[in-house]
Amino acid sequence: MNKIIELTDQNFEEQVLNSKSFFLVDFWAQWCNPCKILAPILEEISKEYSNKVIVGKLNIEENPNTAPVYSIRSIPTLLLFNNSEVLATKVGAVSKLELKEFLDENIN
């Protein structure tokens, strides 16, 4: 059972870019209501897809340096990484079904 990894500007490269697994990163902020809606969905996905993808969250207010590198302009934004490259992007709060379809299309 995977737990969601708390990402920071300091550990982003080590955790995400150096990962040998698919890595889904949620760019979020405390004040963002759609981010709060997405949070429990990500918890469920991290458990259901634990053998396929690692899930991490990066608070853009506490970690202001990473989001601009990936041109994050609105939140929540989900980036799916593989071998240090962005494979796919999903912007906005999505349903669990939409997120599962997004992952299945990109990691299978």
Swiss-Prot record:
The keyword Transport applies. The keyword Transport applies. Disulfide bonds join C32-C35. PROSITE patterns: THIOREDOXIN_2. Keywords: Disulfide bond, Electron transport, Redox-active center, Transport. Residues 2-108 form the Thioredoxin domain. Pfam families: Thioredoxin. Gene3D superfamilies: Glutaredoxin. CDD domains: TRX_family. GO terms for biological process: cell redox homeostasis. GO terms for molecular function: protein-disulfide reductase activity. Signal peptide: none annotated. GO terms for cellular component: cytosol. Belongs to the thioredoxin family. Participates in various redox reactions through the reversible oxidation of its active center dithiol to a disulfide and catalyzes dithiol-disulfide exchange reactions. This is Thioredoxin. The lineage of its organism: Bacteria, Pseudomonadati, Pseudomonadota, Gammaproteobacteria, Enterobacterales. The gene is trxA.
